[in-house]
Amino acid sequence: MHPIVIVGTGLAGFNTVKEFRKLDKETPIVMLTADDGRNYSKPMLSAGFSKGKTADDLCMATPEKVAEQLNVDVRTGVHVAGIDATNKRVLLPDDHLDYSKLVLALGADTWTPPLEGDAVGEVFSVNDLMDYGKFRAAVEGKKTVTILGGGLIGCEFANDLSNGGFKVSLVEPMGRCLPLLLPEQASEAVGRGLADLGVQFHFGPLAKAVHHGDNGQLVTELSDGSQLESDVVLSAIGLRPRISLAKEAGLDTNRGILTDKSLRTSAEHIYALGDCAEVQGHVLPYVLPLMASARALAKTLAGETTEVSYGVMPVTIKTPACPVVVCPAAEGSEGAWEVEAEGNTVQALFRSKDGSLLGYALTGEAVKEKMKLNKELPAIMP
């Protein structure tokens, strides 16, 4: 009997195995990962400096421990070269692995802007525990960090690094914090909260180049001609679902790997979930949808075909300088924001023309309204 093969040992991969083992203790499972296979919580990567956590501190279990606890074969440092969907085979550089069912839990890649300069290779991004360890080593004993990108990850790192004692400069060309998630007044509240920690914002220009400076520092050149000096540069522009492996195997892809509500791809016996998946048009790189997907997929793998449903799934952004909870309206929703603001406390409600609540953004003390508002919202994907 060929094993279930899971490619990826992030939250999506490990949680699928945990849920599956509640239903089936014995079916062989092989997990393949290109990294070191340590189990950790990805959201903690942008909260580690405040708590003084090293990469080892954030590791919840070694691959050996996971293998023992969940009766699974975890193979680390493995590069998957391709998928032969016809013959149900994962292709490795010097071998292959036959599967009964294949789960793609590939995650997403960080997107780095097209920068010039002789220090481009020294720009960090933090997308996994190994990245975090390298970044933490790089900032050891340093004082200043330039962050490229003022979205969710950029703002979380700005807050975390400031709390960790670093002087932070943040570059965001769209002109405000969290521009794709929040209306303007809520963005401004987050900006004020971070500014109070000492974060210096550079709204409007793009980062063009990163050079070595004369004094050992890095110089980030912006499109308006200004220059920022810092010890370290961190790119937090955004994430792109990893789809190349699936695409090369002939699976249908769009923004992510396309699946139905049962997380089945266009190829028989192949499933996808988490940051790499596009489920019925939804790309939701957040923890709550991932956990719902893992529970549903575990049942399907155990023989009970189960569709995933996404209820109301608010996103909590870890910026304690100005707490944020947001529940974005579905893409293409028509409506308008109703905003009440007092200082850094903002309640922004996105309503349709008939007054139905379609989404919200809450900052400061208004985050306490989350549970009440959740009851009014429609499910993301019933």
From Swiss-Prot:
Catalytic activity field: 2 reduced [rubredoxin] + NAD(+) + H(+) = 2 oxidized [rubredoxin] + NADH
Binding site for FAD: T9, G10, L11, A12, T33, A34, K42, V80, E156, D275, V287, K318
Co-factor requirement: FAD
Flavoprotein is among the record's keywords: yes
EC number(s) on file: 1.18.1.1
Free-text function comment from the UniProt entry: Involved in the hydrocarbon hydroxylating system, which transfers electrons from NADH to rubredoxin reductase and then through rubredoxin to alkane 1 monooxygenase.
Family classification: Belongs to the FAD-dependent oxidoreductase family.
Complexes and interactors: Homodimer.
Name of the protein: Rubredoxin-NAD(+) reductase
Organism: Alcanivorax borkumensis (strain ATCC 700651 / DSM 11573 / NCIMB 13689 / SK2)
Upper lineage: Bacteria, Pseudomonadati, Pseudomonadota, Gammaproteobacteria, Oceanospirillales
